[in-house]
Amino acid sequence: LFLVIATMMVPFEILMLPLYQEMMDLNLMNTTAGVILPGLCGASTIFFFRQYMIGLPKDLLDAGRIDGCTEYGICVKIILPITKPAFASMAILSTMGSWNNLLWPMMVYRDADKFTLPIGLNTLLTPYGNNYDVLIAGSMFGIIPILVVFLCFQRYFIDGMVTGAVKG
C-alpha cells in the first residue's frame, strides 16, 4: 500500500518517457487507448479500488461459496455487480483526465485529425494575438461531452464516490 501511495507523489512528467516507450511496444501510438490507458492504471485508481473492495461485506462472498460458486463465479456474479459504481466513477474521472490533458495526447497522437480539443485550442494560440472569443467557445465545447457523460452516469458516480470514501 505504501508503494502505491508513494507513486502518487511522482509527477507524471517523470513517467511520460517510460509510458511512451510502453505505448510504442504495445502498438498503441496514435490510438485513443494509448491516451486513456495510463489514466486507468494509475496509482489513484488502484488505491480507490482497494478502498472500495475493503468495504465489501465478506458475508456476501461466503454466501456465494456456500451456494456453490467458484471463485470466478463469485467475481462475476457477486463482486462485479456490486462494484459497478466504482468502475463508473473511475471511468468518468479517467476520461475527464484524458480529455483535458494536453501534453500526453500531444505525444501519443501523430495525426492532426485525432487531436483532442485542448491540443486544438493550443494551436489557436499565436504570439501575435489571440482570439479569446474562439478560445472560450472551444473551452465550452470541451465541457459539454464530460457533462453529458456525468449526467448519464451520475447515479453510479455518486454511489461510487460515497461508498469508496466512507467505511461503515
Task: Give, region by region, the residue ranges found by the protein language model.
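A structural signal for multi-pass alpha-helical bundles of membrane permease subunits
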Residues: 1-168
